[in-house]
């Protein structure tokens, strides 16, 4: 949806008025990302060295799907690439799920390279408020009212 430069405030207005949706809060995003698990990653507290990870694949793994792109317990494919940041709700531009590849490019290795993809990684609050079209993505949330509703029984149909 984003194909031209846009500030975070402009994007939030667009999302609310054009799509009738909002961004998840950082806590909601972490819950969705973790699939309800309490471990560092949805599959456990570490990385299995047999996993096929984007940016760390070997020659023989070319063309095979990446393990982290598989859907989690909620059926979501989320936080599978440390280069991709997901926008979350905040007063200023706030992201979860990646660091733009800083740890990977910095040579930190797979575990620290993928640590920003953990649901327990602290959200990054950025000062520039400019959405980067190559690295920033969003997951719209349509909120459903869950309180204040009451059931009305139509006695004429009984």
State the predicted function of each range.
Residues 1-107:
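Functional-site microenvironments in short loops/helix caps that host divalent-cation chemistry
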Residues 1-16, 21-24, 95-158:
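Disulfide-stabilized, aromatic/cysteine-rich ligand-recognition loop
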């Amino acid at each position: 949806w984003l194909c031209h430069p846009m500030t975070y405030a402009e994007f939030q207005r667009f999302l609310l008025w054009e799509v009738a949706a909002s961004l998840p809060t950082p806590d909601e995003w972490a819950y969705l990302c973790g699939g309800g698990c309490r471990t560092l990653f949805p599959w456990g507290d570490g990385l299995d060295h047999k996993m096929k990870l984007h940016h760390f694949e070997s020659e023989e793994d070319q063309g095979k799907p990446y393990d982290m792109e598989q859907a989690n317990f909620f059926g979501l494919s989320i936080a599978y690439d440390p280069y991709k940041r997901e926008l979350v709700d905040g007063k200023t531009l706030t992201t979860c799920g990646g660091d733009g590849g800083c740890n990977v490019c910095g040579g930190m290795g797979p575990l620290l390279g993928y640590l920003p993809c953990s649901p327990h990684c602290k959200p990054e609050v950025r000062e520039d408020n400019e959405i980067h079209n190559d690295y920033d993505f969003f997951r719209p949330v349509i909120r459903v009212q869950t309180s204040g509703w009451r059931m009305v029984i139509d006695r004429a149909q009984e």
